[in-house]
C-alpha cells in the first residue's frame, strides 16, 4: 500500500518526468530467493506503467541479489532477470545501447540523458564494500574489474557527467554515531578504493554524483577544498525501517547537468506532502561550490541545523543531536579516517586501517594474556588443594 501510494504521489507531482532515478535496494533485507526476481521485475513493470515516456536510471543496492546482503556475484541469474525487465525503461529511445551487454555482467552501463551533452555512468559499487562476498556464484576479480571499468568510462565519456551508484564513499554516520558510539569510525568502502574513487571523480568535471544506501536525505562534497568540488546527493528511502519518514525527491536539471530546486516529498499523517528542500538551507543550485558554502554556514550557525535535520529524516524525529552533530557534519566533506577524526576532534579508529588492525590485535593479545593468567592461577590453586 505504501509503495502504491508513493507511485501515485510521484505521478501527481510530475506526471511526465524526463528522467526517473532509482538508487538501489529494490528488495527488502533477507528477502527469499524465490521472491527476489519477481519483486524486482514487478517494480519495473509498475514504474513503466506510471511513467511510460521517462528514461530510467537504476543502480543496484546491497540488498539486490536474491542471496543475501552484499552477496551478488557477477553474471548471476538475478542480473539477467533484472536486465530483461529494466532494459526497456533504461534504454528508452536508445539511450543506453550497451546496457544488456554490460549490466548482466556486473551492473555497469552508460547512458545518454535528455539534456544536451549530459551522460550518466552507472555502476554497482557494492563490490567495493568491505562487507562484499559472492554468496551465489563466483566473485572472481569483480572488484578490480568493476573499478577499471568505471575508470575507463570516466576517461572516455564526453561532456558533463552524472555518476550514479548505491553506497557513498566516506563514513557510515549511523553506525559510527549510534552503534559504535564513536569508538569505531565505520567506513562504507574499502579505504584504498574509496581514495582512488574520490581522486578519479576530482580529476573529471562531474556535474552530479548520486548515491543511496543511508535511507536519509543528505549531501556530500568530494574534494571540497579543490577547484572543482563534486556535489553528491544522497537520496532518501520509501521504506521507513530506519526511523525515517518515507520520502522521495524531485529536482530540475539545468543545461550543464546540475540540479536546482531539490525538494523532499514525505509521507506524513497519512498523506504525501512537500516538506521543503535545499532552498530552506539557502541553496538553490545543487553545485559543489554551493554545498561548500552551505557546509561553512552549517558549521558556523547552529540555528540553521534544525532545517537540515528535518530534511535528513524526512520530517521524522532526527537521530542527530547536539552531541553527535559533528559526526554528521564532518562526514559531508571528510571521507578518510584521519581527516574525519581531525574534523570531529574525537577519538575512534577504523577496523579497515592499519591502526585499527593494530588496535584489535592489541585488545586480543590482552584478552588472551588475561585468559592464560587466570588459567594458570586456577591450575596452581587446584594443585595446592589437591584437586
Predicted feature descriptions by range:
Residues 55, 179-274:
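Conserved beta-sheet core of the metallophosphoesterase superfamily
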Residues 3, 25, 61, 123, ...:
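Divalent metal-coordination and catalytic microenvironments
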Residues 127-147, 155-207, 211:
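Active-site-proximal segments of metal-dependent phosphoesterases and phosphodiesterases across multiple
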Residues 15-19, 51-56, 116-119, 156-162, ...:
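Loop/turn elements at helix/coil->beta-strand transitions in domains of secreted/extracellular proteins
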